[in-house]
C-alpha cells in the first residue's frame, strides 16, 4: 500500500491525493506491477479519489478509516463517516478495484465497520498488539478474528 508521509508524522494522518498526482502514481504503479507487485493506494473515502485510483490502474484502494474511528463516539458523525466508507467501497468495486480498509480500527469500532461491503482486507495492528500485552498475541488475534467472522462482504 502506498501511503503519504509527512515530516515527523508518527502515523498516517490522511490519504494520498491521487487526483492531484495521477501521472506520477501511474508511473510508480506501472513499475511496481512490472516487478510483480500489486498496488494499493491509501485514500480518503471520497469518490474523486476512488475514480483517480482507478485511472491510475491501481489493483486496490485502502480506505482510510481514521475519521470513522475518530468520530466513533458520536453516533451522527459515525453514521456519516460510515456512509462515506460504504459509498466509496461500492464505487471502487464498480470500477474493478479491490477494497481494503484501515486506520484506527479496534475491538470496539470494528463490528460497525463490517457494514462496509466488498472488503478484502482490514489493516489492524496497534490495537491487537496493545491487547496482546494483556492477554497474549494468540488470544488477541483470536478475539479480533471472532469479531470479523460475521462479515459477508
Name these PLM-found stretches:
Residues 1-24:
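Glycine/small-residue-rich loop that forms an oxyanion/phosphate-binding "nest" at active or ligand-binding sites
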Residues 2-9, 60-73, 118-137:
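Glycine-rich phosphate-binding active-site loops on the catalytic face of alpha/beta enzymes
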Residues 7, 38-91, 95:
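Histidine/lysine/aspartate-rich catalytic loop segments that bind and position anionic ligands
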Residues 21-28, 49-52, 81-88, 109-113, ...:
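A general structural detector for well-ordered alpha-helical segments in enzyme core domains, enriched
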Residues 26-36, 54, 86-94, 145-152:
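Surface-exposed amphipathic alpha-helices with a cationic face
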Residues 42, 81, 102-103, 133:
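Glycine- and other small-residue-rich loops at beta-strand/loop junctions that grip anionic moieties
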Residues 46-56, 101, 105-119:
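Catalytic cores of alpha/beta
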Residues 73-78, 131-153:
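C-terminal helical cap(s) of enzyme catalytic domains, especially alpha/beta-barrels
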